[in-house]
Amino acid sequence: MGDISAATKAPAPPTPATPETNTTSSSSDTDVQHEPQIPSAASRNLVIFALGLAILVGVLDATIVATLVPTIADDFHSVDSSAWYGSAYLLVTGATQPIFGKIYSTFQSKLVFLSSVAILEVGSLVCALAKNSPTFIGGRAIAGLGAAGVISGGLIITALTTPLKQRPVYTAILGSLEGVGVIIGPIIGGQIASSIGWRWCFWINLPIGAVLCAILVFCLHPPKQTPEREQEQAGKTWTQKLAQLDLEGGLAIAGSITCLLLALEWGGTSYPWSDGRIIVLLVVFGVSLICVAVHQHWKGEAATFPTRLLKNRTFSMFLLCGLCFAGAQFTVLYYLPMWFQAVQGVSAAESGTRLLAMVVSVIVVSVIAGGSAGAVGYLPPFVFFATIFSSIGAGMLYTLHPSISKSKWIGYQILFGAGSGTGIQQAIVGVQVAVDHDDMAYATSAVMLVNTLAGSIFIAVSQTLFLGEMKRVTELIPNLDRHTLLSNFRSIRDKLDHQELDIAVNAYNRGITKAFLIGLVLCSITVLTWPLIRWIPLKKTEDPVKSERRNDPETLNAGNVA
């Protein structure tokens, strides 16, 4: 514990001598962070409440269908297309994140956010009224588009409307709601479907959306753009602003991401990784990614994502932190309920309840760390904390076995949740602090995209290791087919003799703990970012990036570096 304390309480070192690449071409002594224009604390709290509610609705909409799929597929008599009930939403949400970064940087954030909520509500309405599977899938895709704007927009607006030193705690609160939505979505969906019908899972979004829109219309007054950006946009018509969106680049990025997500969704489950369809998707993704990168670099400031931001060392390191912490957390959240059900033989509902230790840890520690970061004035100490605690927690989860005590798996969850939850929130705030005010939307959408892709990528990697163990089980127990083993193992536990059950349970345990090993590796990688993250102060009302740039002699001598 002494080492942990030393790591989290280390004094802030002087500004590193090695400069970072500047994210802007000029700076002025008059450039300041735009202070919130919310007139009162009550109004601000209402706005944060509405933004949090919107994010929660967006995340719940993604996870609530997990327990509804069999019921909806039965109603529509369309089992073959049921996999798209969840995938359509997630694919569109992930693929359109970069586009919304460009939209938020071009148009007024309040208008874009309210429009995103409206799109999400339209998608929910289509799902609630759907008479067949294609209509329902279309509604899910529409809702996913709205959710992309809502989830990233909530964090962007929070960054624009809260003082810099208070931003970590507000971001932690909103980010914690995402974790809550992931856990409680399937539980709420099952309860609503069994009591009043699955369509009410979507009807209920409409009054919630109306309430939060009313709050934001009257209480949200986000700051205007910087004078430079206002001058740049002055006199431009809507048509000219739409032309700025780099639609061809945005669509190319969305297409490339869609190919990757489809390959990860289908690979190893619907089709083997060696299947031609999976190979084609991965090849198209790789080629299109190279083409998109060249196109975005060539477009410069007109691109969907300005590639110059990647030259900012602190921004890139916080992106890496987001990738690692989110990848680890998604992997654990995906496989830990499976461990409870398959290895310990509990129900799906009970496995969700057993995750509460991690959920509470993520919420409580993330909020405390966010408030502490604002008080301390620097983010790096909390990245150290996140790396240490998440690595220890993931390492402990790797030691899970069928006869482990309840106190241990609860304690391991608390450690991992505290570290990974803090790490994800610090990454979100970190990318925002590392860039100038006008680049905040790009930075936020980038880290949200990275978080989304991390979950898909590392769950797929873990699944490959897991399926390898399952293959050995079917070889040892010939009468146990692979499909039943993977989809309905709990229901057949009583049909296996003692020896067969031991073989199957231990194989499940080995396969799932290998997934936790992936989480351990990811969390440990973040230690490499420690010496590379710049100690940017959070307590200044002035733009910290520009302030550091002016006060660093080497920066001034370098001209275009910070």
Curated annotation (Swiss-Prot):
Stated name of the protein:
Efflux pump apf11
- Designated gene of the protein: apf11
What is the membrane topology here?
Multi-pass membrane protein
- Name the InterPro entries on file: MFS (IPR011701), MFS_dom (IPR020846), MFS_trans_sf (IPR036259)
A GO CC annotation recorded here is: plasma membrane
Print the keywords alphabetically.
Answer: Glycoprotein, Membrane, Transmembrane, Transmembrane helix
Does the keyword section mention Glycoprotein? yes
* Similarity field: Belongs to the major facilitator superfamily. TCR/Tet family.
Q: Which GO terms describe its molecular function?
A: transmembrane transporter activity
Q: Which Gene3D superfamilies match?
A: MFS general substrate transporter like domains, Multidrug resistance protein D
Which coarse location class applies to the principal site listed for this UniProt protein?
A: membrane
Q: Which organism is it from?
A: Gibberella fujikuroi (strain CBS 195.34 / IMI 58289 / NRRL A-6831)
